[in-house]
From Swiss-Prot:
One BP term from GO: L-tryptophan biosynthetic process
Pathway(s) it belongs to: Amino-acid biosynthesis; L-tryptophan biosynthesis; L-tryptophan from chorismate: step 2/5
Binding-site residues, anthranilate 1: G82, N113
Subunit structure comment from the entry: Homodimer.
Protein name: Anthranilate phosphoribosyltransferase
Binding site for Mg(2+) 2: D227, E228
Taxonomic lineage: Bacteria, Bacillati, Bacillota, Clostridia, Eubacteriales
Residues engaged in binding 5-phospho-alpha-D-ribose 1-diphosphate: 82, 85-86, 90, 92-95, 110-118
InterPro entries listed in its UniProt record: Anthranilate_Pribosyl_Tfrase, Glycosyl_Trfase_fam3, Glycosyl_Trfase_fam3_N_dom, Glycosyl_Trfase_fam3_N_dom_sf, Nuc_phospho_transferase
NCBIfam families: trpD (TIGR01245)
Ligand binding (Mg(2+) 1): S94, E228
EC number in record: 2.4.2.18
Cited function: Catalyzes the transfer of the phosphoribosyl group of 5-phosphorylribose-1-pyrophosphate (PRPP) to anthranilate to yield N-(5'-phosphoribosyl)-anthranilate (PRA).
UniProtKB keywords: Amino-acid biosynthesis, Aromatic amino acid biosynthesis, Glycosyltransferase, Magnesium, Metal-binding, Transferase, Tryptophan biosynthesis
Amino acid sequence: MIINDAIKKLALREELTEDEVRGVINQIMKGEATSSQIGGFLVGLRVNGETPRQILGAVKAIRDNGVKVEIENTEHLIDTCGTGGDGSKTFNISTAVAIVAASGGAKVAKHGNRAVSSKSGCADVLVELGINIDFDEIQSKKIIEENGMAFLFAPKYNGAMKNVSKERKELGIRTIFNLLGPLANPAPITGQLMGVYDGALLKDIGEVLLNLGLKRAMIVHGDDGLDEITITTSTSICEVKDGKIKNYKLDPEKLGFKKATLDDIKGGEAKENAEIIIKILKGERGPKRDIVVLNSGAALYVANLVDSIEDGIKKASELIDSRAAYKKYEELSSLQVIV
């Protein structure tokens, strides 16, 4: 299907199929659509409401055009990321979580970018932490397999996304592309901890991850708006496990955490956030550590390294207290040139 036909269907409130969306996104990724066509298509999808099958088709199209990180042993291979856009101004929680999870045996393919709506994106804080974000697919494969975590810089691996960057910026609204970054990991991950900016997305993203073949995944949305498992209130969770989906609430107090406020977990610029992460990895206690431990417990769970989130929380605490997590950070920051 060509993009003009898709726009006509959307204008008539007709639903596009997975294959139709995949075809149109492929056309866009190849630079074969005009700005007007791209804008019309994205707005049409948004107004009609993107379905799980349409999101799945778009993810497959991004992967069709991206660079792949070929990892044979996918056991314990995960990503920890969020859609962003929650406006919370927290520090880079999922980045700290990735390091803790890697220290506990997870293989983390951390897919991300620089800041869009926040002061500090994942790439920004990793640079401040001294962790190389520029490895290619061969180097990243080696690092993930041998050291447990590599950062897959989105523009390097999904460069064709640049074909919609201008239109997305000009539209100034959330589109299907706000969801695609966390879903289009270049590595064949089997587990994922993914935060979303809107609780209405939980079930749909759960269906997408199920259809992508993930063994374990948790899609999370704090009831305070956070795209993480929060410690200020409960969190709504959609869990994918063994081919099934279940939805539930998670209360931090029932897991042994003291409730905090959003101000307690606020961050700042990339340099400040890097300092926060290092302090946590060195054992500093408080709400910032608590939210990292809680989410790290979930990451270890989706990596299939523990049988429950409770066991994951216990293991994450031990990894920080034993300095294993900080040692993993030192190891990762020492990897500057890989041949």
